[in-house]
Regions:
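Short beta-strand segments within Ig-like beta-sandwich modules, predominantly Fibronectin type-III
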Residues: 409-416
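Metal-dependent peptidase/peptidase-like ectodomains
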Residues: 184-296, 308
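Alpha-helical metal-binding/catalytic segments enriched in His/Glu/Asp
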Residues: 116, 132-133, 137-191, 352
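Active-site-adjacent mobile loop/cap segments within catalytic or ligand-binding domains
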Residues: 50, 217-238, 285-363
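Beta-strand-rich modules
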Residues: 421-442
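N-terminal capping segment at the start of a domain
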Residues: 22-66, 320, 328-329, 335
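Conserved aromatic anchor
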Residues: 378-391
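A non-catalytic alpha/beta surface segment that caps or lines the substrate-entry region
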Residues: 41-119
Length: 453
């Protein structure tokens, strides 16, 4: 009987924790940002980008009306205009690199990213960066045709327009961490612009805590005729394909954390934040680096060791992707504006903006989170390094069943650096730790490493 009572007590303790959910209190600034995103402005931006006829990275750089040069100068001027209207706190600049001759580059070619940086307001968080991108270059059926009509309305004027709109709206507001709004070139030539930036960021030691790329986010009608207006796909990598496995990844695998990579923790946070503020949109988290054997501008950031994810529409139409503009057998081919759903693109921008704002307002993910493994027991003890931000007031232990994709239970604790969760065994669930600030904003989850002195 005594044994039965003890067992019942453990069950009661382990099942009395509340179900996990994002912070119930919404941030009024994030709500305003979401409302201010404009489908009309996004449409105007996409049509303007298409008006340059081609934005192929090998195209004209001298003309003011045609080619990649005219496009990038217009993007920069548009971001500068918004910056001037919003107080001038954002730094807008070209990030230029020279691409050598390669399979998709006939001659050495300048690849120019347009980068707008909104510095964080909190001293302890200013070096923490969240970056959002879209690629402004376009292509026809071949990436090495610099002169033919390549409108690129969906791929990727849609993502570029979303990034410009976010920069223009969000630069009115203040965030603890730094936000970077970047439109890149050379994506169709092999992720050149993003690769140059990510490698340079790694060398500089930039603390990019999260990166989202938006690529092909404007179409709602797939090749099969199915229309989906309320979903967006979010691709997040697990264990990366590495020739040599660093100790941190080995520890992740040994402890059953294959589904808890930094990219997937970021993606879970994005999904939770976005669906709170844009409830009509469903963020479909897909546990894959990208679409099957395909790629995007988040790859170089992943390869540099940063948490990076990709957003894209749920059901692509390949008649309007990487196609010469033509009518064939009564079918219109080509990436034209009439095949972009501008209202949907605005909703995707809202999803991004809500997630980015939540990340930049909230605290940093806890550091050096360890799960103690000194003895065999059914309780679970953690220790970690305290966050530096003065407004952090506590931490939250979260967990889920090993087969569950999202966090299910949590326990809030005070502003301490060690705690024990009683009656929940590390054998049976996956744990994580979040920081919480005085307003209830939560950080991205940190997966704990095993600790045995």
């Amino acid at each position: 009987m005594r044994h039965l009572i003890v067992c019942l007590l453990v069950v009661i303790v382990s099942t009395s924790f509340p179900a996990y959910s994002a912070s119930p209190k919404k941030n009024s600034d994030i709500e305003k940002i979401v409302k201010e995103i404009s489908a009309k402005r996004i449409e105007a931006t996409i049509r303007k980008l298409v008006s340059f006829e081609t934005r192929n990275s090998l195209s004209d750089t001298i003309s003011d009306t045609k080619g990649v040069g005219a496009a990038r100068r217009w993007i920069k001027s548009e971001m500068e205009r918004c910056n001037a209207e919003n107080g001038g706190r954002m730094k807008v600049e070209f990030d230029e690199h020279l691409a050598p001759v390669g399979a998709r580059v006939a001659v050495p070619t300048p690849i120019v990213n347009v980068v707008a940086t909104l510095p964080g307001e909190q001293t302890e968080s200013r070096d923490r960066i969240y970056l959002v991108s879209g690629h402004y270059d376009s292509m026809r059926s071949t990436p090495i045709d610099p002169d033919g009509f390549a409108p690129g309305a969906n791929d990727d004027a849609s993502g570029t327009a979303a990034v410009i709109e976010m920069a223009c709206v969000m630069s009115k507001y203040k965030f603890n961490a730094t936000l970077v709004f970047m439109t890149v070139a050379g994506e169709e030539q092999g992720l050149l612009g993003s690769t140059f930036f990510a490698k340079a960021a790694k060398v500089k030691g930039m603390n990019i805590a999260g990166m989202i790329t938006n690529d092909i986010v404007g179409n709602t009608k797939g090749s099969d005729g199915k229309v989906v207006r309320d979903h967006v796909r979010l691709f997040a990598e697990g264990i990366p394909p590495l020739k040599e496995m660093p100790d941190e990844w080995i520890a992740l695998i040994r402890t059953g954390g294959e589904n808890d990579s930094p990219a997937r923790q970021l993606a879970r946070h994005i999904k939770a934040s976005a669906e709170r503020y844009v409830p009509k949109m469903k963020v479909d988290l897909i546990y894959r680096r990208d679409r099957y054997l395909r790629g995007g501008d988040h790859f170089p950031f992943l390869d540099a060791g940063y948490a990076a994810v990709r957003m894209t529409e749920p059901n692509e139409d390949f008649h309007h992707q990487h196609q010469n503009v033509r009518v064939e057998n009564g079918v219109q081919f080509g990436d034209l504006p009439e095949f972009v759903d501008f209202a949907y693109t605005a909703d995707v921008a809202r999803v991004n903006a809500a997630a980015l704002a939540s990340l930049a307002i909230g605290p940093a993910a806890p550091r050096e989170v360890l799960m103690e493994n000194m003895r065999l027991e059914n309780n679970t003890t953690f220790r970690w390094t305290a966050n530096a931000e003065p407004n952090v007031t506590g931490y939250r232990v979260v967990w889920r069943e090993t087969t569950a994709p999202f966090w299910q239970k949590f326990e809030d604790i005070g502003n301490v650096t060690r705690t024990t969760v009683y009656g929940v065994s590390k054998d049976n669930v996956v744990f994580g730790l979040q920081a919480i600030d005085k307003d209830g904003n939560v950080s991205v989850v940190t997966y704990p490493k095993p600790f045995r002195p």
